[in-house]
Amino acid sequence: MIKINHLEIRFQGEQNSPYPGNGNLSNNAFLRIRAILERLGFSQRGIHGPVVHASSQIGGRDLRPAHGRGLELWLHPAGRGSGLPHPWRPALRLRAHRQPDRAPPARASEQPLRQGRRALRRRPDQRRHRPRMTAAALRLGAARIGPGLLAGLLMAVLAKLLSQSLHAPAPLLAVVLGMMLGALGLQGQLGAGLDVFAKPGLRLGVAMMGAQISWSEFAALGGPAVLASGAVVLGGLGIGALAGAALGLPLAEALIAAAACSICGASAALAASQAAPSSPENQRTTALVIVGVNLLSTVAMLAYPPIANALGLTAHQAGVFFGLSIHDVAQVAGAGASVSPEVAGTAALAKLSRILWLGPAVVLIGLMLTRTAQGGRISGLQAPPLFVWGFAALAAARGLNLIPPALVSALGACSGFLLLAGVGAISAKLGPKALLEVKPRLAILLVTLTVAVAILAYALTRIFF
């Protein structure tokens, strides 16, 4: 006879309960749980409704939240064994940990040493039972993340449509839509689905950006463009770290802002935020940086063409200057198109050369943050995140002409869509109150980085072109 040493039952609170997730059940659900407990041989004493809890008769421990998604109930037999005469599967998800009615096995240090793989295998009575993925569990998961996924999709679609009609930056509109959704106070119902876009969705979108890098097009600009863009990226990260320290900002926030200003605006900010530690403050900084770089890029789109004319730059030099200095791709194209189509093409290629450095920059940011967390030491080189490997793999595949042109366009559209949904999800989770609190030091850092990158881009344009 095998006795149940303890029993764990996970169940979900009713959605229409006044206190969802805190254990309030309908009478029908309570009767089902009590029937399960009686079937397993537990005493009826200590089982009360409509809230089920464990009293001193069956273990003395109350229900507790399981990460906000359900409850865990730990029960112990009241002085007698609770053997199962035959296999029986209840309607609710149930997991029992069983141990034989004998002394526990000796510790590993007391057991004789054995060679081979068999010594590492557990005996059947030591294996932990794992619940199977059932159709009910799949439906429950879909119901939990479905509303948030739908909200993220709608925000991305609306941001894209409004961007085309209003001629406004799509990431900025996604932030505004996310703030409007967050003002409704639906973070609890939509949080699980929004997390899908705010974490894995963002990383997948950044990885897909690698397919937009065309090595054959870079050959038209030559090696100096790659070197100049690398100098802009490294210089921007260094200036951002130093200026952020002078302003008293955390290194993670300073590097998120520096990546946005020195690489490719909102996309780089999102990629850098995935390399930084996950925290509400870093998410808030990311959203504020996206708003700031879009505003500064719009100002640069209007101001840089007359500045380039006043500085006496040729058409080719002006295109390179726009591509190396303006943050977002859309504003780079707008600034170049205001001069001539040839300048717009040159500016777009120079901008793509900065995106080429996104993967190495994310790895560098991760190393800088790891070194800071370990007190200036790096115990060992850590592997880059998976989305950086995906970015590099797609860039290499595009360079080897392994990706058809139609698939390149599809990957670009999916990447932009996932990034917009991620921006909206982050803004919706934070809410308008957190985003409307202006951080003066962060604003000063963004302006400083914009001016520094422009000066550096102008100097490199004069040197290499």
From Swiss-Prot:
The UniProt record lists the keyword Magnesium: no
Membrane topology: Multi-pass membrane protein
Cell membrane in keyword set: yes
UniProt keyword terms in alphabetical order: Cell membrane, Membrane, Transmembrane, Transmembrane helix
Any coiled-coil regions, as ranges: none
Protein localization: Cell membrane
Superkingdom of the organism of origin: Bacteria
Transmembrane intervals: 135-157, 172-194, 219-241, 251-273, 286-308, 318-340, 352-374, 378-400, 405-427, 442-464
A Gene Ontology term for the protein's cellular component: plasma membrane
UniProt biased composition (Basic residues): 115-132
Positions of region (Disordered): 97-132
A Pfam family that the UniProt record links to this protein: Cons_hypoth698
The family this protein is said to belong to: Belongs to the UPF0324 family.
Name used for this protein in its record: UPF0324 membrane protein CC_0425
Species whose genome carries this gene: Caulobacter vibrioides (strain ATCC 19089 / CIP 103742 / CB 15) (Caulobacter crescentus)
